[in-house]
């Protein structure tokens, strides 16, 4: 009997020429039905704050917003699929940069010498009109990435409200900043731990990277600026040190979700090779780096995932970085680039 009533209601709706949009507003019942919009409530008052705190930290997982969200695939899980087509495979890009420039400097050695500083370099970043690595990556995201990011943002604002969204994103970036400060204290031989730093060392993120830190030695640079004068971009790298005996540009990342494969880190490899290429040709540095390391740390303290990049892999990502840089330059010429929301 209830099924017949339900079928009758459906026929009435079709005969009334209800649109798809109108049908979405109908609340069905087995005994009666009504049509109307739900009463608007304050989404910030009813939000599950624990749930969305974890969600925001998962999406805004990195210091730079090139990775916010850090994954088109993660966005698809949050927002639903956009289309039935498969996401393009980055490995299928066969384009060649028009203006090729080598990532490695043939005039430099990757072996330490007497002129190398005993104290890690920490060159301040000079704010100027030269674009940063983060800005280039932000401004050259695919249209699908931009769309998914904006859709995610609007959904979060709907749930949290404008003030709630700002508060959560601020907390995420503050947490990332403190994580990097704690690592700097650990890796700097001349640093003395303050009470605040000691508290930071007890965080899950620091616990997560303990097994990685055991293999890190010979720190050459920490939170240090690099500039590529020929290709005209700047950046602020996290660390240059030896990992398992090989000198690397190290990038520390945080994530709520496991990222056991380098493909899961999305634009992070491009960030690493961009810093590497700039540093290898920056006169402030006397040495050369040919390897990269992305370390993804987890808040719950579970072991971080290290993603090592040898010289061959770095060269492959360098080609992709040059393409993104050319795309940025072309957009700038066409005056289509807007001021970035975040910078390094």
UniProtKB/Swiss-Prot annotation:
GO BP annotations of the record are: mitochondrial DNA repair; mitochondrial DNA replication; mitochondrial genome maintenance
Q: What is its main location?
A: mitochondrion
Q: What effect is documented for mutating residue 251 to A?
A: Abolishes catalytic activity
Which InterPro entries does this entry report, sorted A to Z?
A: PDDEXK-like_dom_sf (IPR011604), PDDEXK_AddAB-type (IPR038726), Restrct_endonuc-II-like (IPR011335)
Q: Which family does it belong to?
A: Belongs to the MGME1 family.
Additional comments on file?
Answer: This protein may be expected to contain an N-terminal transit peptide but none has been predicted.
Name of protein: Mitochondrial genome maintenance exonuclease 1
Tell me the gene name: MGME1
């Amino acid at each position: 009997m209830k099924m017949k009533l339900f079928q009758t209601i459906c026929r009435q709706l079709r005969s009334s020429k209800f649109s798809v949009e109108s049908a979405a507003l109908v609340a069905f019942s087995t005994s009666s039905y009504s049509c109307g919009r739900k009463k608007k409530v304050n989404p910030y008052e009813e939000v599950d704050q624990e749930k969305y705190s974890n969600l925001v930290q998962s999406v805004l997982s990195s210091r730079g917003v090139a990775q916010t969200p850090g994954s088109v695939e993660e966005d698809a899980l949050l927002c639903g699929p956009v289309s039935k087509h498969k996401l393009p495979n980055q490995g299928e890009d066969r384009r060649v940069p028009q203006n090729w420039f080598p990532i490695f400097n043939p005039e430099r050695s990757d072996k330490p010498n007497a002129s190398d500083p005993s104290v890690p370099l920490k060159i301040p970043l000079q704010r100027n009109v030269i674009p940063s690595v983060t800005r280039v990556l932000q401004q050259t995201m695919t249209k699908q990435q931009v769309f998914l990011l904006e859709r995610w943002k609007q959904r979060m604002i709907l749930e949290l409200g404008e003030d709630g969204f700002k508060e959560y994103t601020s907390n995420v970036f503050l947490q990332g900043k403190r994580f990097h400060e704690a690592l700097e204290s650990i890796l700097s031989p001349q640093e003395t731990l303050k009470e605040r730093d000691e508290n930071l060392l007890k965080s899950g993120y620091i616990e997560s990277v303990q097994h990685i830190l055991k293999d890190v030695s010979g720190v050459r640079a920490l939170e240090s600026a690099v500039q590529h004068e020929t290709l005209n971009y700047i950046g602020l790298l996290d660390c240059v040190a030896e990992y398992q005996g090989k000198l690397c540009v190290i990038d520390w990342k945080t994530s709520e979700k496991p990222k056991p494969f380098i493909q899961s880190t999305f634009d992070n490899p491009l960030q690493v090779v961009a810093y590497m290429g700039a540093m290898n040709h920056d006169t402030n540095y006397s040495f050369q780096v040919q390897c990269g390391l992305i370390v993804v740390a987890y808040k719950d303290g579970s072991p971080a995932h290290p993603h090592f990049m040898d010289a061959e892999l770095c060269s492959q990502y360098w080609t992709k970085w040059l393409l993104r840089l050319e795309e940025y330059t072309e957009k700038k010429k066409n005056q289509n680039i807007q001021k970035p929301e975040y910078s390094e």
